[in-house]
Amino acid sequence: WASGAGLAAGPDTPAGSTYIYAVTGDGDFTANTGGADYGDSFVKLTTGLVPSAYFTPYAQACMNISDQDFGSGGVMLTANTGSTYYAVAAGKQGTIFAMNLANPGGYTAPTNTTCPATGTNANIQSFTGSTHPYFTTPASWKSQIYYLPMFGAISRYNLNLTTPPTCLLRPICTGTAVKSTVTFQYGTNISISASGTTTGTAVLWAAKSSGWPSTNILQPATLYAFDAEHTVSKAIPELWDSTKCPTRDQTGNAIKFVLPTIANGAVYLGTMDRTDPTNTRGELDVFGLTSAACN
């Protein structure tokens, strides 16, 4: 279900055909025995929507019975790493998986028959990105990937572009990822705006709700802008947020999984009208550059 994320699409090799890629939540898994069920799986589909290949964690049975969806977060294709193309996805276990698109790895049964499962996933790189689950889709710009776990900070990882990479996401294997100083609750998605690949133009956007799930009360979102490229005091620096001038910039009430959308020099954020007592009327907040002072 991917927390509102869409599907991914692209070739599986430099000269390969285009495929559609999805990640699924809990459910039956029978693909390894010729069945049609792909619970907790990364699935590679032809453009005719026929499964072509897949990856399923060896712990799928345990994940399924304990509500540990692989597909609670969306799937994203990474920047090209030489002749090998990858996708990344992460779910409720807090594990980030990197799949080789040409050969996602299939399924390898665990070495035990009880939970927690033990074993090895074939042709897969996996990393413990967080002790909390992921309910978000990652974002990327050039060779950088950004991930946000529930109740955590945004983490920035640099792709290892060697061929083939022995460790696709360098900081997870060799050190600590750079993180934002702001932490986020459940339901925040992140996006990037930039002037193409021009250095110094990349901005990372995220909309935070402080009301749900801690109080279950609707509250205005806070839209944040971060410097997507640089590091200040070992952290991702904040550039701006919508609480700086609340009389002008306050948003409507936050909606989980809403993605800040960038087009034509503006940022669009879907919210709920905070003046509506029935909480049924939507609101579209639009942010852009201004020279006007806050008043």
Locate predicted features.
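Acidic/polar loop-and-plug regions of large Gram-negative outer-membrane beta-barrel proteins
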Residues: 5
